[in-house]
Amino acid sequence: MSKYLRTSHPSPLICRPILTFSSLHILTAFLISGNSSYINWSVTIILLILGLYACHRFLNMKKLTRDAQEPLLPHIRPSTRNKIRKYIYGTIFILSIFLLYRSLNSPDTSKHGIGRNGDFIEYEPKAGPTIKEPVENIVKLDVYMEAQCPDTSRFFRQQLKKAWDILGRLNRIELNVIPFGKARCTEKGNDFECQCQHGPTECQINQLMNCVIDRFGFPHRYLPGVLCMQGKYSLDEAMKCVTENYPSEYERMRECASGTRGRRLLALSGQKTASLTPAIDFIPWIVINGSRNSDALYDLTQNVCEAMQPMPSACKDYLRSLQ
């Protein structure tokens, strides 16, 4: 008589390959690609569940009786069952680690989704309409002038000072004052010899203005002194403006205005003046944003305001006052 009966239960050969394949797939994906396709993960987990089910059924088979005529499966020894249980427990442990890892590193569902192939896709947030703040432009204002020119003196008193008082604090004007006018400078070795339209005294005051501008650089520092010097008829009178505005710089400015440095600075202003297109034919020559503006001679504030975009409230108030 046969010792064992035929059975329809799965063979133990099915358990180990399924468990091994599923475990290795999960372990590899866990180490290499945490964002593997969800479809692939689903297939792997289904195979793992089938393997666990098959092994469970195999371990719970009843011992076959000795009356079987066509034995197929041997009696399962306790040692064999223990080995298969190790496979099951190991697989469950790996699966638990994987699920814990995925739960801790899952992407933000509010910003991600699953594409057709099962991979993560990132949604681009739809931003509402944005209102762009207008960019405030800087107005470049260049004034080409000379110290004893009556038209320049009038422009300084009536237009430049007023415009700077109203708009200078806005930090939207790039002001450059170039004292030279219709002078001429000739290079003599390491020095220059200059002739000015209104005589040698004008050259000295022009040189003093250039020294002050070169020394302080910023309009809010040099402009009070230059406004004071404009129209003076002697260097000594112009130096009083240095005493009033820059008392600690008196000796330095006097030496600069009467020496080689002052003449060199005047010659540099002459180069800037000579580069203008078209060439100057009137002093003061006013340039706003690279273009000569003759109307600015009569209302500098209005013309600078019209060049400012957007127009500040100080300009709006000034323009209303003209009506």
UniProtKB/Swiss-Prot annotation:
Please tell me whether the keyword Glycoprotein is annotated for this protein.
yes
* Statement: the UniProt record of this protein carries the keyword Lipid metabolism: no
What does the UniProt keyword field contain?
Glycoprotein, Membrane, Transmembrane, Transmembrane helix
Q: Which domain of life is it from?
A: Eukaryota
Q: Name one GO molecular function term.
A: oxidoreductase activity
The protein's recorded glycosylation sites are: N35, N289
Q: Where is the signal peptide?
A: none
Compartments, as annotated in UniProt: Membrane
State any GO CC term: membrane
The record, for InterPro entries, names: Interferon-induced_GILT
Name the residues that span the membrane: 13-32, 37-59, 87-104
Q: What is its main location?
A: membrane
Topology with regard to the membrane? Answer: Multi-pass membrane protein
Entry similarity comment: Belongs to the GILT family.
The name this protein goes by in its record? GILT-like protein C02D5.2
What organism does this protein naturally occur in? Caenorhabditis elegans
